[in-house]
Amino acid sequence: AGNAGLVASLGAGRVIDYRLEDYAKSTERYDVVYDTLGISSFREARSVLTRTGRYVCPVLGFGLLSASLRTAIIGGRKARFSATGMLKPEVQRAMHAKLVDLVEADRFAPVMDRTYPLAELVEAHRYMETGRKRGNVVVV
Protein backbone atom coordinates (compact mmCIF):
# COMPACT_ATOMS: atom_id res chain seq x y z
CA ALA A 1 0.00 0.00 0.00
CA GLY A 2 1.01 3.64 -0.19
CA ASN A 3 2.19 3.83 3.40
CA ALA A 4 4.36 0.75 2.98
CA GLY A 5 6.17 2.48 0.12
CA LEU A 6 6.59 5.59 2.22
CA VAL A 7 8.04 3.64 5.15
CA ALA A 8 10.42 1.78 2.82
CA SER A 9 11.59 5.09 1.35
CA LEU A 10 12.45 6.24 4.88
CA GLY A 11 14.91 3.35 5.24
CA ALA A 12 13.08 0.46 6.92
CA GLY A 13 14.81 -2.86 6.24
CA ARG A 14 11.52 -4.70 5.74
CA VAL A 15 8.00 -3.28 5.61
CA ILE A 16 4.94 -5.44 6.10
CA ASP A 17 1.49 -4.21 5.12
CA TYR A 18 -0.65 -5.63 7.91
CA ARG A 19 -3.68 -5.68 5.60
CA LEU A 20 -1.97 -8.05 3.17
CA GLU A 21 0.33 -10.17 5.30
CA ASP A 22 0.23 -11.67 8.78
CA TYR A 23 3.78 -11.08 9.96
CA ALA A 24 3.25 -13.32 13.00
CA LYS A 25 3.04 -16.34 10.67
CA SER A 26 6.34 -15.49 8.96
CA THR A 27 9.33 -17.80 9.12
CA GLU A 28 11.62 -14.76 9.08
CA ARG A 29 13.11 -13.40 12.31
CA TYR A 30 13.45 -9.73 13.14
CA ASP A 31 15.58 -7.73 15.55
CA VAL A 32 12.81 -5.14 15.87
CA VAL A 33 9.08 -5.15 15.20
CA TYR A 34 7.93 -1.53 15.29
CA ASP A 35 4.15 -1.37 15.44
CA THR A 36 3.36 2.24 14.55
CA LEU A 37 -0.40 1.88 15.02
CA GLY A 38 -0.60 -0.30 18.09
CA ILE A 39 -2.70 -2.90 16.28
CA SER A 40 -0.50 -5.85 17.14
CA SER A 41 0.85 -7.15 20.44
CA PHE A 42 4.04 -8.46 21.96
CA ARG A 43 2.36 -11.86 22.18
CA GLU A 44 1.92 -11.88 18.38
CA ALA A 45 5.39 -10.47 17.69
CA ARG A 46 7.28 -12.79 20.04
CA SER A 47 7.32 -15.68 17.56
CA VAL A 48 9.12 -13.65 14.87
CA LEU A 49 11.62 -11.85 17.10
CA THR A 50 15.23 -12.93 17.32
CA ARG A 51 16.40 -14.17 20.72
CA THR A 52 17.25 -10.58 21.75
CA GLY A 53 14.61 -8.92 19.58
CA ARG A 54 12.42 -5.99 20.58
CA TYR A 55 8.75 -5.21 20.01
CA VAL A 56 8.37 -1.42 20.06
CA CYS A 57 5.11 0.49 20.01
CA PRO A 58 4.28 4.18 20.60
CA VAL A 59 0.71 3.33 21.66
CA LEU A 60 0.57 2.39 25.34
CA GLY A 61 -2.19 0.04 26.39
CA PHE A 62 -2.57 -2.40 29.27
CA GLY A 63 -1.24 -5.33 27.21
CA LEU A 64 1.95 -3.50 26.24
CA LEU A 65 2.44 -2.16 29.76
CA SER A 66 2.05 -5.66 31.19
CA ALA A 67 4.41 -7.18 28.59
CA SER A 68 6.98 -4.41 29.15
CA LEU A 69 7.04 -5.02 32.90
CA ARG A 70 7.13 -8.81 32.51
CA THR A 71 9.90 -8.85 29.88
CA ALA A 72 12.01 -6.35 31.83
CA ILE A 73 12.47 -9.08 34.41
CA ILE A 74 12.62 -12.28 32.36
CA GLY A 75 13.47 -13.48 28.88
CA GLY A 76 15.65 -12.20 26.08
CA ARG A 77 12.89 -10.80 23.90
CA LYS A 78 11.55 -7.48 25.14
CA ALA A 79 8.40 -5.43 24.79
CA ARG A 80 9.00 -1.68 24.83
CA PHE A 81 6.83 1.40 24.90
CA SER A 82 8.50 4.11 22.84
CA ALA A 83 7.98 7.69 23.95
CA THR A 84 10.73 10.27 23.67
CA GLY A 85 9.44 12.16 26.69
CA MET A 86 10.15 9.16 28.93
CA LEU A 87 13.86 9.13 28.11
CA LYS A 88 16.49 10.50 30.48
CA PRO A 89 17.30 14.18 29.88
CA GLU A 90 20.85 13.41 28.69
CA VAL A 91 19.49 10.93 26.13
CA GLN A 92 16.95 13.51 24.92
CA ARG A 93 19.69 16.14 24.62
CA ALA A 94 21.81 13.76 22.53
CA MET A 95 18.83 12.97 20.29
CA HIS A 96 18.04 16.67 19.86
CA ALA A 97 21.69 17.41 19.02
CA LYS A 98 21.62 14.67 16.38
CA LEU A 99 18.37 16.11 14.99
CA VAL A 100 19.94 19.58 14.78
CA ASP A 101 22.92 18.08 12.94
CA LEU A 102 20.58 16.39 10.45
CA VAL A 103 18.63 19.62 9.88
CA GLU A 104 21.82 21.64 9.40
CA ALA A 105 23.11 19.04 6.93
CA ASP A 106 19.78 19.18 5.07
CA ARG A 107 19.31 15.46 5.75
CA PHE A 108 16.11 15.73 7.80
CA ALA A 109 12.88 15.53 5.87
CA PRO A 110 9.85 15.22 8.14
CA VAL A 111 6.82 13.71 6.48
CA MET A 112 3.92 16.10 6.85
CA ASP A 113 0.43 14.84 6.09
CA ARG A 114 -2.02 17.53 7.16
CA THR A 115 -2.24 20.74 9.14
CA TYR A 116 -5.33 21.74 11.11
CA PRO A 117 -6.14 24.99 12.92
CA LEU A 118 -6.69 24.60 16.66
CA ALA A 119 -10.43 25.11 16.14
CA GLU A 120 -10.45 21.80 14.19
CA LEU A 121 -8.65 19.76 16.84
CA VAL A 122 -11.47 17.21 17.01
CA GLU A 123 -11.31 16.67 13.23
CA ALA A 124 -7.53 16.26 13.41
CA HIS A 125 -7.90 13.61 16.08
CA ARG A 126 -10.59 11.80 14.09
CA TYR A 127 -8.32 11.76 11.06
CA MET A 128 -5.46 10.31 13.09
CA GLU A 129 -7.74 7.58 14.45
CA THR A 130 -8.53 6.38 10.92
CA GLY A 131 -5.06 4.83 10.69
CA ARG A 132 -4.67 6.38 7.24
CA LYS A 133 -2.32 9.23 8.04
CA ARG A 134 0.87 9.31 6.01
CA GLY A 135 3.04 11.40 8.27
CA ASN A 136 2.72 14.03 10.93
CA VAL A 137 -0.57 15.73 11.61
CA VAL A 138 0.03 19.24 12.92
CA VAL A 139 -2.37 21.41 14.89
CA VAL A 140 -1.55 25.14 14.94
Where are these regions (language model features)?
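Terminal helix/beta-alpha structural elements that buttress the NAD(P)+-binding lobe
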Residues: 1-140
